[in-house]
Amino acid sequence: MTDYGEEQRNELEALESIYPDSFTVLSENPPSFTITVTSEAGENDETVQTTLKFTYSEKYPDEAPLYEIFSQENLEDNDVSDILKLLALQAEENLGMVMIFTLVTAVQEKLNEIVDQIKTRREEEKKQKEKEAEEAEKKLFHGTPVTIENFLSWKAKFDAELLEIKKKRMKEEEQAGKNKLSGKQLFETDHNLDTSDIQFLEDAGNNVEVDESLFQEMDDLELEDGEDDPDYNPVAPGSDSSD
């Protein structure tokens, strides 16, 4: 006949010698104790830890001991669930033998796996952030590719804004007491207005948005130059060349 009490006392003595710094007796009847299990150090010396509480059943080891997660550090809920499932499996497989050392060893290995998973997850997150930063920098450097369509669209917008600036400038001059120009005078001074576009832009401050990236690549935009045409005649037919 099995002497369960003797087997339990012998195992308790062995456990106390194996885990001198992490073994704590909670009660003697029924025998109940805790063992703190810590993983190996991971990145930045980070560890995960759990304290297991065991209570011998009357017919242990022919019956599984009672067990629970007494406390834990740095473990997710799913990690705790996995550890409890592992303990149940190991207890079932080792019925009839003293098993606390086997259960604790299995949990120790599981904690080491969790630390490795944390390290892998953080490395993947770091790589993902670096990839996103690289793509953002590349997009910022290259900008929007220039096409004839978006250049002409920008040019139309630029010309419209420039015209508004000219009108505003003329209105301000009129309000300042200057004589309003006639149609002929406006025509004659149009050249001066064109050559003073830069001054208008400076006065406008940030009112005109210029996308510099549109000027980076203009290979696809062909501008006609009459002087490159071999049949080009600067003197139109029928004009008086003596003028």
Curated annotation (Swiss-Prot):
<comment type="subunit">
    <text>Interacts with DRG2. Interacts with androgen receptor.</text>
</comment>
<feature type="modified residue" description="Phosphothreonine">
    <location>
        <position position="144"/>
    </location>
</feature>
<keyword id="KW-0007">Acetylation</keyword>
<feature type="region of interest" description="Disordered">
    <location>
        <begin position="208"/>
        <end position="243"/>
    </location>
</feature>
<comment type="similarity">
    <text>Belongs to the RWDD1/GIR2 family.</text>
</comment>
<feature type="compositionally biased region" description="Acidic residues">
    <location>
        <begin position="209"/>
        <end position="231"/>
    </location>
</feature>
<dbReference type="Pfam" id="PF05773">
    <property type="entry name" value="RWD"/>
</dbReference>
<dbReference type="GO" id="GO:0005737">
    <property type="term" value="C:cytoplasm"/>
</dbReference>
<comment type="function">
    <text>Protects DRG2 from proteolytic degradation.</text>
</comment>
<dbReference type="InterPro" id="IPR016135">
    <property type="entry name" value="UBQ-conjugating_enzyme/RWD"/>
</dbReference>
<dbReference type="GO" id="GO:0030521">
    <property type="term" value="P:androgen receptor signaling pathway"/>
</dbReference>
<dbReference type="InterPro" id="IPR006575">
    <property type="entry name" value="RWD_dom"/>
</dbReference>
<dbReference type="GO" id="GO:0071394">
    <property type="term" value="P:cellular response to testosterone stimulus"/>
</dbReference>
<dbReference type="Pfam" id="PF16543">
    <property type="entry name" value="DFRP_C"/>
</dbReference>
<protein>
    <recommendedName>
        <fullName>RWD domain-containing protein 1</fullName>
    </recommendedName>
</protein>
<dbReference type="InterPro" id="IPR032378">
    <property type="entry name" value="ZC3H15/TMA46_C"/>
</dbReference>
<feature type="region of interest" description="Interaction with DRG2">
    <location>
        <begin position="142"/>
        <end position="197"/>
    </location>
</feature>
<keyword id="KW-0597">Phosphoprotein</keyword>
<feature type="domain" description="RWD">
    <location>
        <begin position="10"/>
        <end position="114"/>
    </location>
</feature>
<feature type="modified residue" description="N-acetylthreonine">
    <location>
        <position position="2"/>
    </location>
</feature>
<dbReference type="GO" id="GO:0034599">
    <property type="term" value="P:cellular response to oxidative stress"/>
</dbReference>
<dbReference type="GO" id="GO:0002181">
    <property type="term" value="P:cytoplasmic translation"/>
</dbReference>
<dbReference type="InterPro" id="IPR040213">
    <property type="entry name" value="GIR2-like"/>
</dbReference>
